[in-house]
Amino acid sequence: MCDDDVSALVIDNGSGMVKAGFAGDDAPRAVFPSIVGRPRHQGVMVGMGQKDSYVGDEAQSKRGILTLKYLIEHGIVTNWDDMEKIWHHTFYNELRVAPEEHPVLLTEAPLNPKANREKMTQIMFETFNSPAMYVAIQAVLSLYASGRTTGIVFDSGDGVSHTVPIYEGYALPHAIIRLDLAGRDLTDYLMKILTERGYTFTTTAEREIVRDVKEKLCYVALDFEQEMLTAASSSSLEKSYELPDGQVITIGNERFRCPETLLQPSFIGMESAGIHETCYNSIMKCDVDIRKDLYANTVLSGGSTMFPGIADRMQREISALAPPTMKIKIIAPPERKYSVWIGGSILASLSTFQQMWISKQEYDESGPSIVHRKCF
């Protein structure tokens, strides 16, 4: 189907960031925020050439005059017109390729609604005229990127987290657990607890500043109670951060209280089990014979697993839940922020994968529902 000289494109559409590039590369060429910004006010200056919408980094840099909207909520696309804008921007501005010349591998959230997969397929073939495409589940790609075909992936991005047990390359749908708690909720929580300290962050632009604070200064405590005592009795855990306007803020126990929410969702009023329990529950829904393989291959993936200390804490918490003799191994690859994309890059460049693409011809014969037959 595909000639060897045409490289496939790999696009991982996350709730927070789009990662895009060419199959066979070891990292994405383009990484930009999944946002579309629209001007808050009608332009007054004539001839300024103000656009009616801005995408990605350009929207980010003009955030002072725009209203920013993330169009992928909890991993699921909610606004297809904006999604088309983002894909258009990816092809033409970021990768500078003609979409009709390259097969495209897209990623989707586990348990993505069927209608959504069909819509993605339809847009690729009808709007962008792709010669071929494929839709792969994000967590499965992360597992491939870690060099495994069996394991449980805890994938946590900006909009949603999932625990996905995978056996011999196939996700086990009955055991997948979705947790609507991820990076964006942590950012919102950090905004809230910084307000208690007397700093106010309210606008969409200020939220981006707080996200940066979170990424640079937060970490997961090995023992939360102990860490709280340390923070209360000394200032050794305090760090300062300079805001864009030059004002300096100091942040103390917020540094680990923010990501602790992943383990204690009650912090933000969610009645859900923490990520350690969710992993355990997911494993317990699987056949008793494969649990040992899952415990020993627990792979972290996604930007919200980048907090220092998260792997040690998960190891400790899951060990407390699992049978005492069980060997537990948490794998936290350094490039896990992009492991979904890297897995896609690996998959799309395998010679054995080339017969898996959905071709334009197959799409024309069967319509969008072909995606359920070819991608699973």
Swiss-Prot record:
Tissue occurrence: Embryo. Predominantly expressed in the aboral ectoderm cells.
PROSITE patterns listed in its UniProt record: ACTINS_1 (PS00406), ACTINS_2 (PS00432), ACTINS_ACT_LIKE (PS01132)
Catalytic activity: ATP + H2O = ADP + phosphate + H(+)
Recorded GO MF terms: ATP binding; hydrolase activity
Signal peptide: none
Compartment annotation: Cytoplasm; Cytoplasm, Cytoskeleton
GO cellular component, one term: cytoskeleton
Keyword Cytoplasm: yes
Record's keyword annotation contains Cytoplasm: yes
Propeptide, residue positions: 1-2
Chief location bin: cytoplasm
EC number: 3.6.4.-
InterPro entries documented for this protein: Actin (IPR004000), Actin/actin-like_CS (IPR020902), Actin_CS (IPR004001), ATPase_NBD (IPR043129)
Enzyme class: hydrolase
CDD domains per the UniProt record, alphabetical: ASKHA_NBD_actin
Chain positions found as N-acetylaspartate: 3
Alphabetical keyword list: Acetylation, ATP-binding, Cytoplasm, Cytoskeleton, Hydrolase, Nucleotide-binding
Role this protein plays: Actins are highly conserved proteins that are involved in various types of cell motility and are ubiquitously expressed in all eukaryotic cells.
Family indicated by similarity: Belongs to the actin family.
Protein name: Actin, cytoskeletal 2
Originating species: Lytechinus pictus (Painted sea urchin)
